[in-house]
Amino acid sequence: MAKSSLKNLLTLVNEAKKQSPVAESFLQDYLQSIERTANSNKRKPSAHYKPSSLNCIRNMFYQIVEQEPDSSIKEAPLIGIGESGTDRHEHLQNAVIEMKKNGFACEYLDVAKYVEQKELPGIIVKGKRGIETQLFNETWNISFLCDGIIKYRGELYIIEFKTEVSRKFVTRNDVDEDHKRQAIAYSLSLGLDKIIFVYENRDTCEKK
């Protein structure tokens, strides 16, 4: 019985080895398909500044002349990292929306309605990307996505989520300097001087 079981196991192993070239071929085709989809959907940069580009004069130049600073093809791992970051943002934002239902003094405000009600000069609502709201500041030619505005314990705040690798997260004890510059652009555009940053560890989902 034991010899028969061992023989069956060896047969399965050998069959798996025979199939491995097919599996490897599938994997390579799968990765290439991901890359082709992502790269064919690449949008031409708009001639507007983005808060994240304000930290680098070079990036600002490429943005305003509608050029990609790096025209290389994106590879599947980097595409996946970007997609996972977008997915996490949606989960993090949905968790904020649930806070009021769970008895906490926190209300997630509709950014588009807030902009319209406040009649903020030069601020145009371009649309939605999931829960995020795409805004454009005509005065400064800045286009940006707002994670959200919340009313927490009676005060209004812009809320911004950031995900990062463990190496950065474990030493995180303050808002990143680059993110502070982004916050200034958001604050001046929306007329709100209070911003809450939530950082999440991509590997463990811990938060600070």
Predicted regions and their residues:
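Metal-dependent nuclease catalytic regions and adjoining charged, substrate-binding loops involved
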Residues: 9, 14-22, 171-176, 188-208
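Metal-dependent nuclease catalytic cores that hydrolyze phosphodiester bonds in DNA/RNA
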Residues: 1-158, 165-167, 171
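Short, glycine/acidic-rich beta->alpha junctions
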Residues: 140-141, 175-179
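A short beta-strand motif that forms part of the nucleic acid-binding face
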Residues: 162-165, 201-203
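Short amphipathic alpha-helical face segments that pack within enzyme cores
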Residues: 87, 91, 181-185, 189
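Hydrophobic/aromatic-lined pockets within catalytic cores
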Residues: 97-100, 163, 188-194
